[in-house]
């Protein structure tokens, strides 16, 4: 189901930490002091600095409206959550529908508005693509609801471990390294390099891969 496309420019594990992924160019260097500052700000949820000063326009989206779209479309559902309708196929990217992008729902960054369509009203999805495992891109609650209405989940290397832990059928998970590709019907999806990092806690930094995508 997967293949290498073009010349390989894959990630190499760093020598002193062979279980971690690295960027090909500039590395992010953070100290424990940096991590503490970020974590403190994350959980305190500094609304004064982050809250928009104007209302964000949100147009409700219904299943009937999606069905009526005759041409290829890109529909932004909030933050990085994006629904693609391509050749009558539905592909959802980085689904985050929970109230907060956080390991718990009683604290952490809170969304500014509800998604224009609910998880339950989404059509059957041909694929879900995940870019990396940060909480604002990989949402456990959303995955648990979506897992039975998605044909395939496409992730960077080792991100699939989260999905399988949350009950997604292992046969539905495709993990790709940079420059590997897979197909959904006639649509080719290629994992490409990105400059970032990964992790969902204090001690799992860069243990999963991150990627941009060409579709």
Where are these regions (language model features)?
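Metallo-beta-lactamase
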Residues: 1-110, 115-121, 215
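Active-site metal-binding motif and surrounding structural segment of the metallo-beta-lactamase
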Residues: 27, 34, 107-154
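Divalent metal-coordination and catalytic microenvironments
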Residues: 84, 94, 132, 153, ...
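Catalytic core of the metallo-beta-lactamase
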Residues: 85, 183-215
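Structural motif
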Residues: 89-91, 127, 187
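Active-site environment of divalent metal-dependent phosphoester hydrolases
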Residues: 134-138, 160-162, 180-183, 198-199
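Loop-centered beta-sheet repeat module
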Residues: 153-156, 161-166
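Helix-loop-beta element that forms the nucleotide-linked donor phosphate-binding surface
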Residues: 163-177
């Amino acid at each position: 189901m997967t293949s290498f496309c073009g010349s390989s420019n894959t990630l190499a594990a760093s020598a002193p930490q062979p279980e971690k992924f690295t960027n090909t160019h500039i590395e992010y260097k953070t100290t424990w002091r940096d991590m503490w500052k970020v974590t403190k700000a994350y959980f305190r949820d500094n609304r004064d600095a982050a809250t928009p000063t104007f209302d964000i326009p949100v147009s409700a989206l219904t299943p009937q409206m999606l069905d009526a779209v005759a041409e290829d479309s890109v529909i932004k559902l909030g933050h990085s959550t994006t629904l693609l309708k391509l050749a009558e196929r539905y592909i959802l990217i980085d689904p985050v529908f929970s109230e907060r992008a956080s390991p718990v729902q009683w604290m952490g960054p809170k969304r500014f508005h509800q998604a224009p369509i609910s998880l339950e009203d989404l059509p059957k999805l041909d694929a879900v693509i995940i870019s990396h495992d940060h909480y604002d891109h990989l949402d456990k609650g959303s995955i648990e609801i979506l897992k039975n209405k998605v044909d395939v989940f496409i992730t960077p290397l080792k991100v699939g471990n989260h999905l399988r832990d949350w009950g997604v059928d292992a046969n539905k998970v495709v993990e790709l390294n940079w420059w590997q590709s897979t197909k959904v019907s006639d649509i080719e999806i290629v994992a490409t390099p990105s400059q970032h990092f990964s992790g969902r806690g204090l001690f799992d930094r860069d243990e999963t891969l991150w990627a941009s995508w060409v579709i």
